[in-house]
Amino acid sequence: MAFNTPTLSTLIKQGEQQFQYRFPTLKRHNVIGVINRICAALSAGEHMHLDWLARQIIPTTAEEDYLIEYCLYKGIVRKQASTATGLVTVTAANDTTIPAGTVFEDTNTGLTFITTQETVVKAGTADIAVKCETTGVEGNLKAGTSLSLTSAILGLLPTATVKVMSGGADIESLSRLLARLIYRVQYPPAGGASHDYIRWATEVPGVTRAWCFERYYGGGTVGVAFACDEREDILPTPEDIARVRAYIEGHKNEVTGQFEGMPANVELYVFAPQFQAVNFKIRLAPNTPTLRQAVRKSLAAYLANAGVGALLYLSQIRATVSNTAGEVDNSVIFPTADVQLLSDNIAILGDIEWL
C-alpha cells in the first residue's frame, strides 16, 4: 500500500483532534494550540526529510551525488569529460622546428589546440599531433577546419588545417549513467558474454550505444558496432574505433583496480555502422505543423532505439505515430511492410511526405 506523506495542515488537524480527545474541556485560543502547531511543523519537516531520503535509496529517483555513489558500489564510474586529439596539417617554407606547446586557434569558436611534442617538419606540408585545451565534444572539429597560429614561427605559414580531430566528450549525463547502471544490474558481468562487450564499449567516453554480434565471422569471432550520439556526426571515426578496441581488449577497472577485458582466443572486429535512411508517407489528422514536428520527433526516437541491422515492424511504426500527443487519426501509406535494415546499418529518419 502506498504511503502518502501528511501535509502540515493534516498534522495540525491530527494534533488538534488528539488534544481535544485528551482534554475535552480545553478552551480555544490557548497555549496548547501554539504548541500543537510547533510540533506539527517539526513533524512535517521530519516527514519531508524521510520522503527525500526514500527517493535517494532508489537509483531511478536518487539525486546526483547518491546516484554516483550507488554506481560506484556497483562498479560503475561516471564518464568524465575528455579532450579531443588529432592531427593538423601545417605548411613550412623550409625545414622548421615546431616546439611542443605551440598553440593553434579556431577563430570561429575560440577553441585552442596545443602541440603535444616537438616536431621538425621539412619544406612542404606535414601532419602534427595536437590536443584541444578544452574538454568536451565541441573540440571534435570537422576535417578541413582552418586554425591559426597564436604566435608566429619563422618558416611556418600562419594557418593550419584540421586533418582529423576526435575523442572529445562531455561529462556523462545522469540519464545515461543511470541507463548503464540498470544495464549492469539486469546483465551482470559474465566473463565475455555479448552483453559484456556492450558494457565495455559504452564505458568509453563519448560512446552512447553499442551492439554485439556473436560469431561475426564464424566461430571464435565477435563483432562490435557503436555510435556517439552526443556528437553532430554520430558515426565513429577510425580513432574512435581504435580507442574502443583497445579498451575492450583490456583495461584496468577504476573501482577495483583489477585488469579486465575480452577473453583470450577471441578475434575482435570493431566497426562503425552505416546510416540507412527510412522514408515515410503519412496521412495525418490534424495535419498541422506542430503535430507534424511532434510525429517527426517520435519517429526519430523510435528509429534511434532500433539496433544495427534491426527489423522495423510496420505495426510499431503505426503505433509510434498514433501515440504522439495531439494525434487524432493517421494512415501510414509508406512503408507498406516491415523494413529490414542491412546487417551493418542503423536507421535514421529520412524524408516524410505528408498527405
From Swiss-Prot:
<protein>
    <recommendedName>
        <fullName>Mu-like prophage FluMu protein gp47</fullName>
    </recommendedName>
</protein>
<comment type="similarity">
    <text>Belongs to the Mu gp47/PBSX XkdT family.</text>
</comment>
<dbReference type="InterPro" id="IPR006949">
    <property type="entry name" value="Baseplate_J-like"/>
</dbReference>
<dbReference type="InterPro" id="IPR052399">
    <property type="entry name" value="Phage_Baseplate_Assmbl_Protein"/>
</dbReference>
<dbReference type="Pfam" id="PF04865">
    <property type="entry name" value="Baseplate_J"/>
</dbReference>
